[in-house]
Design a protein with these regions (language model features):
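C-terminal helical "tail/cap" subdomain of flavin- and related membrane-associated enzymes
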Residues: 185-265
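Conserved FAD-binding catalytic core of PHBH/FMO-like flavoproteins
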Residues: 42-129, 134-137
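A general structural signal for well-ordered alpha-helical segments in protein cores
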Residues: 3-4, 8, 63, 119, ...
Length: 265
């Protein structure tokens, strides 16, 4: 993807990041030795994750997601939009003034939809952009996963390896951004005080984020289950509820802040 290419480019320029070739014994050495002060593990399928971080709360949404990026005419593109369709939630997530990321979650994985059908549905519900073209579609099964324990000794799980939620309005990425901010602040604080970067940072990180991430992800799960239930009955409940809430200024102000910043308890 373009984002991956940009990250790779920045990493190559960064003198503090060293690229290494992973050998078979690499993960065993990390687990056994104390060569590094802190290790951040964001890969879900490596030996560290499988051997140490395997206790998770999981849920199969029994849904599939289609993702793509659309190119469109230039516009002020600074608002994420979530539409609850009869097939499932459709999210328009700003990427730039000429590109928007699309995430379409089909509620029933048994109802196979072709790329052509998904494209037609996106065009049908799009009221915001003059679309010029679609990039390649990606399709994946949706599953919820959140770790019970965030760290082991000096190893911290991070990103999708830490929590993977339903892509309602792109909130999974927002959760990771908030985690990055909290972890970065904790590291800066230790450095400013001249204290070592050790596992105490990971303990503090878990203490500051675990309850918020769980509450937040549970809220996303509730919204998903509600609209899945509501979808079976012709969206009668959601139409009335959203119609009422749409007129409530206080609710709209809070929900916008919640979407941008998440929980702040």
């Amino acid at each position: 993807s373009e984002l991956y290419a940009l990250v790779q480019k920045d990493i190559k320029k960064n003198k503090f990041i060293k690229k290494i070739k992973i050998k078979k014994s690499f993960y065993d050495e990390i687990i056994k030795n104390n060569k590094f002060d802190l290790i951040i593990n964001s890969e879900t399928q490596n030996k560290i994750s499988k051997k140490i971080f395997f206790k998770r709360i999981t849920k199969d949404y029994k849904s599939v997601a289609f993702t793509t990026i659309v190119k469109h005419q230039k516009c002020i593109n600074n608002k994420a939009v979530q539409i609850f369709t009869s097939c499932g939630p459709l999210a328009f997530l700003p990427y730039s003034n000429t590109e928007t990321s699309i995430v379409f979650s089909v509620l029933d994985e048994k109802k196979n939809k072709s790329e052509k059908e998904i494209k037609e549905l996106i065009i049908k519900y799009n009221k915001y952009y003059k679309i010029n073209s679609f990039k390649n579609f990606e399709k994946y099964n949706l599953k919820f996963s959140i770790l019970r324990k965030y760290y082991h000794k000096n190893i911290l799980c991070f990103g999708d390896n830490l929590h993977n939620i339903h892509p309602l309005a792109g909130q999974g990425f927002n959760m990771t951004l908030r985690d990055i901010k909290i972890l970065s602040d904790l590291i800066d604080e230790k450095i400013d005080l001249g204290l070592p970067l050790d596992s105490s940072i990971l303990k503090e990180f878990e203490s500051k984020t675990k309850h918020l991430n769980y509450i937040f992800s549970s809220g996303i799960n509730f919204i998903h289950e509600f609209f899945k239930f509501d979808n079976k009955y012709g969206n009668n409940y959601s139409k009335e509820i959203l119609k009422y809430l749409g007129k409530n200024n206080l609710f709209n102000k809070y929900i916008s802040k919640f979407a941008d910043q998440g929980l702040a308890l």
